[in-house]
Design a protein with these regions (language model features):
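A charged N-terminal "starter" segment
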Residues: 1-116
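Short, structured patches in soluble enzyme cores that scaffold and shape functional sites
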Residues: 102, 122-124
Length: 135
């Protein structure tokens, strides 16, 4: 096939083989995550094979939401977390997992937690809110 436009071909079968290989080496106690920024076009193909999708920007989160990725399957990571993005994420999906890159991000996350929700260890956001990082 001749074309004037560059294109990429991804073999999801090979990707699944690689995931199976990693699973064999690491066992089931290790969770695997797919970094959405690597290639947003294969997200749907990755969902059944990894435990989490690492999302590092509001744009990546929007893509995952449009594709119907369950919020509990996303890890909100990276340094680019605006206050409005964190607040919207916490309100729309209180069970999401977050990485915190700084005390500023921790304070933003803790400040976005609903005050009326009972604390439980099963809700990572609430567990973070219980931590005392002021001393």
């Amino acid at each position: 096939m001749k074309t004037d436009t560059a294109y990429y071909v991804f073999d999801l079968g090979r990707v699944r083989e690689r995931i199976a290989y990693l699973r064999q080496l690491l066992g089931t106690e290790v969770s695997l995550a797919y970094a959405v920024k690597a290639n947003t076009f294969i997200i749907e193909g990755m969902i059944p094979y990894v435990q989490r999708l690492e999302v590092c920007s509001p744009g990546e989160a929007a893509i995952c939401e449009r594709l119907g990725v369950p919020p509990e399957k996303m890890v909100i990571s990276g340094v680019y977390k605006t206050p409005s993005f964190i607040e919207r994420s916490v309100i729309s999906a209180p069970g999401r997992i977050y990485t915190v890159e700084s005390l500023t991000q921790f304070d933003l996350l803790r400040g976005s937690c609903p005050k009326s929700t009972p604390s439980t260890d099963s809700n990572p956001v609430r567990a973070l809110q219980k931590a005392d990082c002021t001393t």
